[in-house]
UniProtKB/Swiss-Prot annotation:
The H2 subclass of histamine receptors mediates gastric acid secretion. Also appears to regulate gastrointestinal motility and intestinal secretion. Possible role in regulating cell growth and differentiation. The activity of this receptor is mediated by G proteins which activate adenylyl cyclase and, through a separate G protein-dependent mechanism, the phosphoinositide/protein kinase (PKC) signaling pathway. GO terms for cellular component: dendrite; plasma membrane; synapse. Residues 317-327 have a biased composition (Polar residues). The record marks 98 as: Essential for histamine binding. The lineage of its organism: Eukaryota, Metazoa, Chordata, Craniata, Vertebrata. The chain crosses the membrane at residues 23-44, 58-81, 93-114, 135-159, 181-204, 235-258, 268-289. This is Histamine H2 receptor. Residues 316-340 are annotated as: Disordered.
Length: 359
């Protein structure tokens, strides 16, 4: 999800420091991959999570998952080895994937904020405004725009500082070049403008939600639904807040590097703000679990279903064996007096009184 930049490699002289950084980066990658896999599986298992809003959340989780699988491992290797060892061609692919995933993440968060805005500002028309077809079109546009902006700009050299150097690769470095125009345009289009719109939408959402809560506080039937809706909004706002905290320092450094030169930022500082941005991909699943009850339920179902199924199977086997033993030991007269149980489609059992079968 790193936008238009890759891991800045700085050499670590201390062995202990290098081991510590290796462990931290490995844990971050593991949490990113595992956490976003859990998000996708939870939505698949829990029907309450299968709604249009969560389509964008799943898209965001897929983006972060791809980041953890396709970008972060190579960023960590580059960070720790202090050199790029995978060649020029793969450097261009790697940086293009990095930019694409960042753009997709921002656009997903942007669409989530618009979805929440429609749900709170005009709840009666929400089913008309947000339809499955429109959501599908939005998701397709998110990925088409992301692919176009990333691969097109890098492979055509729009980010380069001179006409002769259109690549992103030197002998030992793999780093996207940033010129003045590219730094300003990309920073505004992919981060600052979406961030501004999201802040405005969430401000209006919270303002309307607060006014509605005051007006309908005495109506219990509306109160429960409103509380659930507001909790979902708070959760999504927390996700966006984490995104701002994680990525704002990097984009500030990115624009500054475009204005002042590729070497204007200290490599240590650049690496810190970059990996702070990467950490956002690991935070999103944690935020869902901490703030959203439906996601907590989905996580519980995911982690407990296999254990529950295993225990249920063992219990069923013991019950069947016990029932068979009792049946074989009963006398025929006792079997005839056994109450009749009628199984209905609703899943409940209706027990007939003894002797009902004799009538």
């Amino acid at each position: 999800m790193a936008p238009n930049g890759t891991a800045s490699s700085f050499c670590l002289d201390s062995t202990a420091c290098k081991i510590t950084i290796t462990v931290v980066l490995a844990v971050l990658i593991l949490i990113t991959v595992a956490g976003n896999v859990v998000v996708c599986l939870a939505v698949g298992l829990n029907r309450r999570l299968r709604n249009l809003t969560n389509c964008f959340i799943v898209s965001l989780a897929i983006t972060d998952l791809l980041l953890g699988l396709l970008v972060l491992p190579f960023s960590a290797i580059y960070q720790l080895s202090c050199k790029w060892s995978f060649g020029k061609v793969f450097c261009n692919i790697y940086t293009s994937l990095d930019v694409m995933l960042c753009t997709a993440s921002i656009l997903n968060l942007f669409m989530i904020s618009l979805d929440r805005y429609c749900a709170v500002m005009d709840p009666l028309r929400y089913p008309v405004l947000v339809t499955p077809v429109r959501v599908a079109i939005s998701l397709v546009l998110i990925w088409v725009i992301s692919i176009t902006l990333s691969f097109l700009s890098i492979h055509l050299g729009w980010n380069s500082r001179n006409e002769t150097s259109k690549g992103n690769h030197t002998t030992s470095k793999c780093k996207v070049q940033v010129n003045e125009v590219y730094g300003l345009v990309d920073g505004l289009v992919t981060f600052y403008l979406p961030l501004l719109i999201m802040c405005i939408t969430y401000y209006r959402i919270f303002k309307v939600a607060r006014d509605q809560a005051k007006r309908i506080n005495h109506i219990s039937s509306w109160k429960a639904a409103t509380i659930r809706e507001h909790k979902a909004t708070v959760t999504l706002a927390a996700v966006m807040g984490a995104f701002i905290i994680c990525w704002f320092p990097y984009f500030t450094a990115f624009v500054y590097r475009g204005l002042r030169g590729d070497d204007a930022i200290n490599e240590v500082l650049e690496a810190i703000v970059l990996w702070l941005g990467y950490a956002n991909s690991a935070l999103n699943p944690i935020l869902y679990a901490a703030l959203n009850r439906d996601f907590r339920t989905g996580y519980q179902q995911l982690f407990c279903c296999r254990l529950a199924n295993r225990n249920s199977h063992k219990t069923s086997l013991r019950s069947n064996a016990s029932q068979l033993s009792r049946t074989q030991s009963r006398e025929p007269r006792q079997q005839e007096e056994k109450p009749l149980k009628l199984q209905v489609w609703s899943g409940t059992e209706v027990t007939a009184p003894q002797g009902a079968t004799d009538r």
